[in-house]
Amino acid sequence: MLSAIVRSSVAALATLLLSGLGSAGGIHEVHMSNDQSVQAQEQATRVVIDRFNDAFNRHDADALAALLTEDTVFEDTSPQPDGKRIEGKAAVVEFWRGWFTRNADAHFDAEDIIVSGSRATVLWVYRKMRNGQPWHLRGVDVFTVREGKVAAKFAYVKG
């Protein structure tokens, strides 16, 4: 009985291979194509995140605006405990303009950027002067990128 099942399975596999699914254009190539598609999406996501971080550190609200979807959502780290949710490109850009004015010396250093498809997690250190002394805070941003723009940015901090 077992040898009949094995023979049947081998025959089915041989039929599959001979039908062209195992050759060019078949299963292996589809798998590679999917890997390449995911890799391309992750590269595109990384480019958007790098551009966002660069514009942020230049305090360039107009450059940030160009990187946001119209329905973008930003969740700030304050007020504690849950932060403030800001919805829509215009409101988010207005928030950042004010933030840049209040934090003219602020700089974010990305320690690590982890990309998975259209999502990215950025581990960062926020640095500025506070009361004349260097000060820093560590945190994480979770981004969602859609069609080459930031659709969501959720910020979390330690402490």
Language-model features and meaning:
Residues 52, 64, 72, 88, ...:
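Hydrophobic pocket/interface hotspot
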Residues 27-30, 136-159:
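Short beta-strand edge/turn micro-motifs at domain boundaries
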Residues 9-20:
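Bacterial N-terminal signal peptides
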